[in-house]
Amino acid sequence: MSKLLYVRDHEGFACLTVETHRNRWFAAHIVLTKDCGCLKLLNERDLEFYKFLFTFLAMAEKLVNFNIDELVTSFESHDIDHYYTEQKAMENVHGETYANILNMLFDGDRAAMNAYAEAIMADEALQAKISWLRDKVAAAVTLPEKILVFLLIEGIFFISSFYSIALLRVRGLMPGICLANNYISRDELLHTRAASLLYNSMTAKADRPRATWIQELFRTAVEVETAFIEARGEGVTLVDVRAIKQFLEATADRILGDIGQAPLYGTPPPKDCPLTYMTSIKQTNFFEQESSDYTMLVVDDL
């Protein structure tokens, strides 16, 4: 009967589930009216870049093809199951939000959107990124290895995209998109914490890969993500590949620390990182807009 009746069996995941409930948001909360007026302020190169990023983000879950359900069923835990049910629900909200953004970027032309999505699948930078990650997913045999690859997907795979989108806030453009990016990147930070907790609490130390294997995995992940943004971000307003690489290295070190590993780079985050805007508390007039404050205030993303 213990499998049928709920009993709190993992305090950490029970707390993460509550945190997810408190921070729940919906695609309808993202109003893109002002963003439509900002489109004319983007030059052709910038508009193409952001079309590419959002198309990639909208397709990413299907492209990676990581079976989270298979991973979760490895554990007999009500709280782990409950948390990942909530996480999957939030991923659906992300997908709906990206669909709304693409609808705006392509002016409602579904045929053009589909043709563009099909065309970028031949992009070398995207193919290199997807192929690398698919190879890692396929090569992960043990449970700890699978969780570590999942951790990379949550914590590294989208960082350069989130960073680049956050630069629109620096330019005073796309308030709806920036709010969505704020929410989604914070959700992914929570998902990264969950994957770290899964690794730390649900795998035996004797079964975990060697430290050298883990560091090599993270090192190549940072290289692949850097190459991705380097290939696609050239000539885009404010996109600084060196700063993004610095942020990627700092993020990798933070995640490695979360799973009890030594830092790989010793790199601090860039001084003017646009994602630090996520940590600021905003005073919101209820009658002007919904509050975008997130109950999980991130004091230091890294």
From Swiss-Prot:
Assigned keywords, A-Z: DNA replication, Host membrane, Iron, Membrane, Metal-binding, Oxidoreductase, Transmembrane, Transmembrane helix, Viral latency, Viral reactivation from latency
Source organism, top-level taxon: Viruses
Catalytic residues in the record: Y98
E.C. no: 1.17.4.1
Any single GO BP term: deoxyribonucleotide biosynthetic process
Topology class, membrane: Single-pass membrane protein
Assembly description: Heterotetramer composed of a homodimer of the large subunit (R1) and a homodimer of the small subunit (R2). Larger multisubunit protein complex are also active, composed of (R1)n(R2)n.
Name used for this protein in its record: Ribonucleoside-diphosphate reductase small subunit
Organism of this sequence: Epstein-Barr virus (strain B95-8)
Gene: RIR2
